[in-house]
Amino acid sequence: MNFTKILFFVVACVFAMRTVSAAPWNPFKELEKVGQRVRDAVISAGPAVATVAQATALAKGK
């Protein structure tokens, strides 16, 4: 009996929080932000990768 009361309370709280939110959650916008972060990380890592490649080539004697 207590479990059903607790479950009902949790579901009611979640429902209230979902209906009060100002802006709807857009998963595609979040996915786009993640893609931009990955793109920026790859761009910023480019010079470091080139430096490591040069160091490896020098170490091998090529």
Curated annotation (Swiss-Prot):
Task: Give a Pfam family name.
Answer: Cecropin
Q: Which InterPro entries match?
A: Cecropin
Signal peptide: which range, if any?
A: 1-22
Where is the protein situated, by its record's location annotation? Secreted
Please give the function described in this protein's UniProt entry. Cecropins have lytic and antibacterial activity against several Gram-positive and Gram-negative bacteria.
Q: Which family does it belong to?
A: Belongs to the cecropin family.
| Name listed for the protein in its UniProt record | Cecropin-D
